Amino acid sequence: MLDIFRGLKNLVKVSHVKTDSIVFRLHYSITVMILMSFSLIITTRQYVGNPIDCVHTKDIPEDVLNTYCWIQSTYTLKSLFLKKQGVSVPYPGIGNSDGDPADKKHYKYYQWVCFCLFFQAILFYTPRWLWKSWEGGKIHALIMDLDIGICSEAEKKQKKKLLLDYLWENLRYHNWWAYRYYVCELLALINVIGQMFLMNRFFDGEFITFGLKVIDYMETDQEDRMDPMIYIFPRMTKCTFFKYGSSGEVEKHDAICILPLNVVNEKIYIFLWFWFILLTFLTLLTLIYRVVIIFSPRMRVYLFRMRFRLVRRDAIEIIVRRSKMGDWFLLYLLGENIDTVIFRDVVQDLANRLGHNQHHRVPGLKGEIQDA
């Protein structure tokens, strides 16, 4: 089991070369690790122990009843959840049925939880896979081990010149590259919101408000409350088994089934609800931040200055005014990866070139906007 988790850690290991934001890494690293770990835990408990154990009569073999109820799903009675346990009912939702089909709440998700968690992990990694493909190793190629900063002066000078030449010759050609990353962040937001609705469908419309109901349950008077965790993840359910009797007539057998995995499922999904809400909030803030960056050159100057204090303000203003948003984004990522002193020199040299060469001015309306 430990070897599996080590392999899982390597799968979602964050590279030392930073090509994305912290919030984006929460999606493809931490969240994928959490979902895969939960999937492995449920899979282990499901296929090593007994995922379902039904109380049966001697007429029905134990393995037959357990297998049937596992495949066909079990149910509880909605009208019995507010009955007092140990007095009116033996357990919430368990008791005699009045024959109303609408009163039955079926639990069809039980055997699919491990697969669903695995599928969710794949969906969370997809934006990362897409950005990795689009990024193409550009940042890793451009930093040329300048993140270490320990090399001879001649080698350092040569690498700085190569980096500066690339930035100069490719200025104004990085917008689509940056927009592709922003699209991946947007996909991450769509994914986490979509997964909330996916889980809501998975649990028959009970997941969207699950966390709110848990909070409300904790604050409600004990006499008037219904545990939403027991309602969605019951430990004990009913199962109806039909078979032919000795006279050839169909016999109906009611069984009580224990669902031990729901003890774990309950904790997993209450955690995931709050985690997904947090991810949604952080990702939404990140996208608002991206929109501000796209439309506000002054904000780009401010953010660059706040992050890289060794770089002179006039150099930053020249670069932002004479380049496009994609160039700013590339420089920002390079600054995250390169030695601070080397990065300061590269930015200053680029600003000097731009100051002495007017032909690199951004033409048209874009240039007027970026001159603001």
Curated annotation (Swiss-Prot):
Q: In which tissues is it expressed?
A: Isoform Neural is expressed in synapses of giant fibers (GF), in a large thoracic cell in location of postsynaptic target and optic lobe lamina and medulla. Isoform Lethal is expressed in embryonic mesodermal derivatives. During metamorphosis, both isoforms are dynamically expressed in pupal nervous system.
Cytoplasmic domain ranges by topology? 1-21, 132-182, 289-372
User: Membrane-spanning regions, if any?
Assistant: 22-42, 111-131, 183-203, 268-288
Please tell me whether the keyword Nucleotide-binding is annotated for this protein: no
Membrane topology reported for the UniProt record:
Multi-pass membrane protein
Q: What does this protein do?
A: Structural component of the gap junctions at electrical synapses in distal and mid-depth levels in the lamina. Isoform Lethal forms voltage sensitive intercellular channels through homotypic interactions.
* PANTHER family documented for this protein: INNEXIN, INNEXIN SHAKING-B
Q: What name does UniProt use for this protein?
A: Innexin shaking-B
The gene coding this protein: shakB
